[in-house]
């Protein structure tokens, strides 16, 4: 058996984490031969609820769950951490503007970024799930100057999975028949679900769908799926978000499927003309515990306009919290 690795989960008593922690402990994220130490962070008022979650984890008797830490101290939660899933974030309350939300979360993610910088393993892999995920990841990354910025990612895998599912449903094919789905940009309603490079059973997906359906139904459906779930369920998507987090980390750690790629919010190196340093979703291939942006994809005017629009939104979010970012 391998030596255990430390996995930090923030917002650990929340809805998404309740769908996430048990799957991590069962080996779904890092493999059936990798023991884990779960380091769970919560705000002080939620520690009692977290204790209940830890009791349930105990009661599952997972062979791979080596031990657990429950804490309200970020420095303890990130100590020697190898993987971190930053799920906890300030939800948008009634009457809150987006900029209020950005500022409230900037405070949370700057503290966590500093704790990662000071206490985590130098090779830590960080996935930000809590919204606004791309900008929260940027804030954490900027507060961890001693950690390679490539080690901070934001989750757009839920959008990627939604895009695949909507296409599979339209064409009446299996999810397994679809490859090379791409989400560009922000995890928000400006994201661009791109089918121009996607394949269905090896054939171009874009040739199988009507252009009006693609532009006027498919793209808005994927962009606004989160809001549709809140309307139907009365709560935001939790199990599907947890599932996407598992997929994102699993592929980053263990490798993405051969001949395919995944969508990840990553540190832009200027690829496709996107401003360097933004956390932007690109098509990525993962192997040997690292990711690379897929290069050389042709981008037409339709795609370029949408890729730029979501970049502009991310620049605006960054500028809204600029005063709170380290120089």
Curated annotation (Swiss-Prot):
Binding site for substrate: 92, 98, 131, 162
Catalytic reactions of this protein: (S)-malate + NAD(+) = oxaloacetate + NADH + H(+)
First-tier enzyme category under EC: oxidoreductase
Name listed for the protein in its UniProt record: Malate dehydrogenase
Organism: Teredinibacter turnerae (strain ATCC 39867 / T7901)
Keywords: NAD, Oxidoreductase, Tricarboxylic acid cycle
GO BP annotation list: malate metabolic process; tricarboxylic acid cycle
GO molecular function: L-malate dehydrogenase (NAD+) activity
Binding site for NAD(+): 11-17, 105, 112, 129-131
């Amino acid at each position: 058996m391998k030596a255990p690795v430390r996995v930090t989960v923030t917002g650990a008593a929340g809805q998404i984490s309740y769908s996430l922690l048990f799957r991590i402990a069962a080996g779904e994220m890092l493999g059936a031969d990798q023991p884990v130490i779960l380091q769970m962070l919560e705000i002080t008022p939620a520690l009692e609820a977290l204790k209940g979650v830890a009791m349930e984890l105990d009661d599952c008797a997972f062979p791979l769950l080596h031990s657990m830490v429950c804490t309200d101290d970020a420095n303890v939660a990130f100590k020697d951490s190898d993987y971190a899933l930053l799920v906890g974030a300030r939800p948008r309350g009634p009457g809150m503007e987006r900029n209020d939300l950005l500022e409230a979360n900037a405070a949370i993610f700057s503290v966590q970024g500093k704790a990662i910088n000071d206490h985590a393993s130098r090779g830590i892999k960080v996935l930000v799930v809590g919204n606004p995920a791309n900008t929260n990841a940027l804030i954490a990354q900027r507060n961890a100057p001693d950690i390679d910025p490539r080690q901070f990612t934001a989750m757009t895998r839920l959008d990627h999975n939604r895009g695949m599912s909507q296409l599979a449903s339209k064409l009446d094919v299996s999810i397994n028949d679809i490859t090379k789905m791409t989400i560009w940009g922000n995890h928000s309603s400006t994201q661009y679900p791109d089918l121009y490079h996607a394949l269905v059973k090896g054939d171009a997906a874009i040739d199988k769908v009507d252009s009006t359906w693609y532009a006027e139904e498919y793209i808005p459906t994927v962009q606004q799926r989160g809001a549709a779930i809140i309307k139907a369920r009365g709560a935001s998507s939790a199990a599907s978000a947890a599932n996407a987090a598992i997929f994102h980390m699993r592929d980053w750690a263990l490798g993405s499927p051969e001949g395919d790629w995944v969508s990840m919010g990553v540190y832009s190196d200027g690829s496709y003309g996107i401003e360097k340093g933004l956390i932007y979703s690109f098509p990525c291939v993962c192997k040997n515990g690292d990711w690379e942006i897929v290069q050389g994809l042709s981008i037409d005017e339709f795609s370029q306009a949408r890729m730029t629009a979501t970049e502009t939104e991310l620049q605006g979010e960054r500028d809204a919290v600029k005063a709170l970012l380290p120089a």
